[in-house]
């Protein structure tokens, strides 16, 4: 039974005789995987490996093959249906996701970040989950509360943490204004709460189910504590997204802004609404044994509200034995904004730092100066922080995502371009083996190539359905033989084995073509085709990693290594290369006024070298 009111929650039974899954000691050791639940798995796939590694033969959807590309575009009607399907519910479920823990575990994923799962307004196709109507229930498209509990239990059995995407800033389109056009800043009268069809037929106040039985479960807003005008700011929709206080008070399009309280960050007075939100998200931690939250749209909340919420949640999680419950904030903008927001609010990590995706993706493709990416993580007067201490567990890094909010213009996954598939492994490896908590966006390991004029093209279905990647339909993509999946799994296994690759300091290394003249790799003209090496150092260990931005031929370069850690004649051994024949080969440390080694990196390839011991 789903409670209609917070007063009905039985906190004693939620915590009695339970041992909760402990937090990881270090989140920088984890590899995150972000998935949109509606687009991930419906559980009907055939020919994939189950959680134990056995081939499933009972499904109905076959595995995608290259010959299936474009099978949805054979007729104009088929193309139209494919595009339209991208804006609707497709059928991914919690049960389907539960069957893919083996797929994720074998890839090297240690934590999943799941898009919002809570009950949505019933008259919109809000498959993305950001339009909540009942904060205490799971949307029936996704399954049930028990399905969530089973998912988390299974994930924990496979050593995978579960982070839920949550919303504090707004609810779904749960009421209608009297006016048709309601731009901020207004003080707009409300017609009523919306019924299951979207009509504002329910009085705007505490719901009497005897008079309005249609309000449960699909009308108004739940739990009942939210059924008061004071829950909402009611000032109309945002037009100027960077205008203060418009971006704090305004509705997010049709999504209704919630009123959190008032006051400065040090003297913030939470509203009843914010107190209720705290209770709701405490409930989900206890009910399902959740390990972390990703907070949506932190920019649109007062920092005092964010800090109050973070404090309450961290305290509650500690009572359950989750001493490192992680709160990741979507903090758009640059590094300085991320730093100040984290320092002031008590959030644990920032996601959405604007510079990272662009500089990472285009470095790999050869169109950004390598130092533009690596200097993002350097000791900086801007941050007044020692970089390797701060960035290692304070920033979640990724290059593909579900909305590309900071990029503007058209939407495109990394592999949408002509050569993206050639070097996507390099992008995934660069993300995994540099500072920060790496996050993989679902489908990147299968070279998803969506692009277009809206977010839907970034949200193809892994299980195929009517909106698969490569303009396909009814073909799934859980292919563990895909070369990118297979090679990334090897790289992530090495990352898991090598503490230095997870926690070490990092330095972009100077290179030389002749062994005499050394300098940092840099773009000349419009592009760079070169070895790009960097070192990770922890205590007295150095591991050298390098990629090649030349798509067509191997590149060789002398690469500087730490002068004090290595002696002339010492050897580095290749522990990974996209050219398997290089693995276990060695190179010698030479003195050419600097200590250096000569590395050859395959075309569009990637290598990892460590000192040969003994």
Where on the chain are the PLM-derived regions?
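Substrate-binding/active-site clefts of carbohydrate-active enzymes
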Residues: 18, 24-30, 38-288, 309-320, ...
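C-terminal beta-strand-rich structural cap/linker in extracellular carbohydrate-active enzymes
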Residues: 31, 586-614
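Active-site rim elements
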Residues: 18-19, 84-90, 267-269, 294-297, ...
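Active-site clefts of carbohydrate-active enzymes
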Residues: 391-417
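Short, well-ordered beta-strand segments enriched in hydrophobic/aromatic residues
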Residues: 542-549
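Short acidic/polar active-site loop segments enriched in Thr and Asp
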Residues: 110, 291, 438
């Amino acid at each position: 039974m789903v409670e209609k009111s917070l007063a009905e929650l039985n906190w004693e039974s939620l915590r009695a005789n339970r041992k909760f899954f402990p937090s990881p000691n270090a989140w920088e050791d984890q590899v995150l995987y972000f998935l949109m639940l509606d687009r991930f798995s419906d559980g009907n796939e055939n020919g994939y490996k189950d959680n134990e590694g056995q081939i499933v033969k009972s499904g109905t959807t076959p595995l995608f093959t290259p010959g299936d590309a474009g099978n949805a575009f054979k007729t104009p009607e088929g193309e139209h249906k494919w595009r339209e399907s991208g804006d609707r519910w497709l059928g991914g479920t919690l049960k389907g996701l539960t069957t893919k823990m083996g797929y994720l575990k074998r890839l090297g994923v240690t934590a999943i970040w799941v898009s919002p799962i809570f009950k949505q307004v019933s008259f919109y196709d809000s498959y993305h989950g950001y339009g909540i109507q009942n904060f205490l229930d799971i949307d029936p498209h996704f399954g049930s509360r028990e399905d969530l509990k089973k998912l988390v239990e299974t994930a924990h059995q496979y050593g995978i943490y579960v982070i839920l995407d949550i919303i504090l800033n707004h609810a779904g389109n749960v009421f209608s204004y009297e006016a048709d056009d309601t731009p901020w800043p207004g003080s707009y009268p409300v017609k009523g709460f919306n019924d299951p069809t979207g009509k504002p037929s329910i009085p705007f106040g505490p719901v009497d189910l005897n008079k309005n039985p249609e309000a449960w479960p699909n009308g108004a807003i739940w739990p009942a504590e939210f059924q008061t005008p004071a829950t909402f700011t009611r000032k109309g929709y945002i037009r100027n997204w960077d205008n203060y206080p418009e971006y704090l008070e305004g509705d997010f399009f049709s999504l209704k802004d919630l009123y959190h309280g008032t006051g400065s960050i040090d003297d913030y007075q939470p509203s009843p609404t914010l107190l209720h939100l705290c209770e709701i998200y405490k409930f989900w931690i206890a009910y399902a044994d959740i390990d972390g939250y990703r907070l949506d749209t932190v920019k649109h909340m007062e920092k005092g509200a964010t800090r109050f919420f973070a404090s309450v949640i961290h305290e509650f999680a500690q009572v359950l034995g989750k001493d490192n419950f992680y709160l990741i904030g979507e903090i758009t903008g640059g590094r300085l904004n991320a730093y100040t927001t984290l320092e002031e609010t008590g959030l644990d990590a920032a996601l959405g730092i604007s510079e990272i995706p662009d500089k990472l993706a285009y470095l790999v493709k050869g169109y950004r100066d390598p130092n533009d990416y690596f200097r993002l993580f350097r000791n900086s007067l801007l941050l007044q922080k020692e970089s390797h201490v701060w960035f290692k567990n304070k920033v979640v890094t990724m290059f593909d995502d579900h909305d590309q909010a900071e990029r503007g213009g058209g939407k495109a996954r990394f592999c949408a371009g002509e050569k993206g598939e050639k070097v996507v492994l390099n992008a995934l490896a660069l993300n995994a083996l540099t500072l920060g908590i790496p996050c993989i966006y679902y489908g990147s390991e299968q070279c998803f190539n969506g692009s277009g004029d809206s977010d839907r093209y970034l949200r193809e279905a892994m299980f195929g359905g009517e909106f698969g990647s490569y303009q396909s339909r009814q073909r799934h993509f859980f292919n563990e033989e895909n070369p990118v999946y297979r090679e990334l799994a090897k790289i992530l296994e090495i990352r898991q084995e090598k503490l230095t690759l997870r926690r070490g300091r990092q330095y972009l290394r100077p290179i030389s073509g002749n062994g005499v003249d050394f300098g940092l790799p840099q773009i000349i003209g419009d592009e760079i085709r070169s070895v790009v090496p960097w070192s990770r150092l922890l205590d007295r260990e150095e591991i050298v990693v390098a990629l090649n931005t030349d798509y067509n031929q191997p590149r060789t370069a002398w690469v500087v290594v730490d002068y004090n850690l290595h002696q002339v004649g010492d050897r580095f051994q290749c522990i990974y290369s996209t050219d398997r024949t290089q693995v276990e080969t060695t190179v010698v440390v030479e003195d050419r006024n600097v200590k250096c080694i000569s590395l050859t990196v395959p075309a569009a390839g990637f290598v990892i070298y460590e000192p040969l011991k003994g």
